[in-house]
């Protein structure tokens, strides 16, 4: 026990995601009722969404902000629809065993919250840089896990408190440049010309994200196959070897690069390798884009 009530608002409103308890907002002292679950889920999105409107307000270009918000909201709602339908539909493997799943796929979920609320949270926490959880992402259905991972790999929807939606802004720069070339005029955005220097920075920032994810995942996969003694000395890493084990490693580096923090927790990641490698990926994925945007 501890000052949980004081930490939860900071965790949620600040898109920080680090819970007082190890199981985060699955814990009844951190998220006791369905009402607190709704408030905490709302708190994740309120400031990242507000930043889009603040952009339009301060630049006096509200229509631009509305269009950006519309694209982000569409992507978010599409993810919510997929995850909620997947989780409330239940697991077909359990159906085949003749076991009723009236409440949906409840593995890794809290009974007081249910499958739909957990699915909603899983999308909300990955479209932002929050990373808090109210259920186990590792136990969600395959398509739900894909949406969670895809949200962080795209790494543009809503963003988070601190840097806002800077990655979406980078995609805007690239899109404006390409569209300017297509119509045969000098690309401009917000009255500023977009030239070779801006495009080089935008390209580096855009390509860095998948680069650090894939390099980290490939290194982990290589060590697991070719250095089994090293992996065993660290505790074995994978509790789910095979296809899902690769997904767990990919999710880990994706989450770090996106400054998210959620995980497929079947991965034993509290080891020297994972702490150091994820720390490096976190620094590169966080600070290089900030420097690029400022430049």
How would you describe each model-predicted region?
Residues 1-295:
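Membrane-proximal intracellular helices of multi-pass ion channels
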């Amino acid at each position: 026990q501890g000052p949980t009530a004081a930490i939860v608002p900071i965790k949620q409103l600040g898109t920080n995601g680090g819970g007082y308890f190890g199981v985060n907002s699955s814990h009844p002292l951190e998220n006791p009722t369905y009402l607190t679950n709704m408030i905490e889920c709302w708190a994740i999105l309120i400031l990242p969404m507000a930043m889009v409107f603040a952009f339009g307000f301060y630049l006096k270009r509200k229509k631009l902000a509305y269009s950006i918000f519309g694209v982000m909201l569409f992507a978010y709602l599409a993810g919510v629809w997929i995850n909620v339908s997947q989780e409330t539909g239940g697991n077909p493997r359990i159906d085949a065993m003749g076991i009723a799943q009236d409440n949906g796929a409840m593995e890794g979920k809290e009974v007081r919250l249910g499958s739909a609320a957990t699915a909603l949270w899983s999308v909300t926490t990955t479209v932002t840089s929050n990373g808090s959880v109210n259920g186990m992402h590792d136990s969600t259905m395959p398509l739900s896990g894909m949406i969670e991972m895809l949200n962080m790999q795209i790494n543009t929807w809503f963003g988070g408190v601190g840097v806002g939606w800077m990655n979406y802004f980078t995609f805007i720069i690239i899109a404006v440049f390409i569209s300017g070339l297509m119509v045969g005029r000098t690309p401009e955005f917000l009255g500023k010309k977009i030239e070779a220097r801006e495009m080089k920075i935008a390209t580096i920032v855009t390509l860095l994200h998948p680069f650090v994810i894939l390099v980290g995942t490939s290194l982990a996969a290589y060590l697991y196959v070719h250095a089994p003694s090293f992996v065993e000395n660290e505790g074995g890493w994978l509790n789910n070897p095979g296809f899902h084990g690769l997904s767990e490693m990919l999710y880990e580096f994706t989450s770090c690069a996106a400054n998210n923090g959620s995980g497929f927790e079947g991965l034993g990641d509290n080891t020297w390798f994972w702490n150091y490698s994820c720390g490096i990926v976190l620094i590169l994925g966080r600070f290089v884009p900030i420097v690029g945007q400022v430049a």
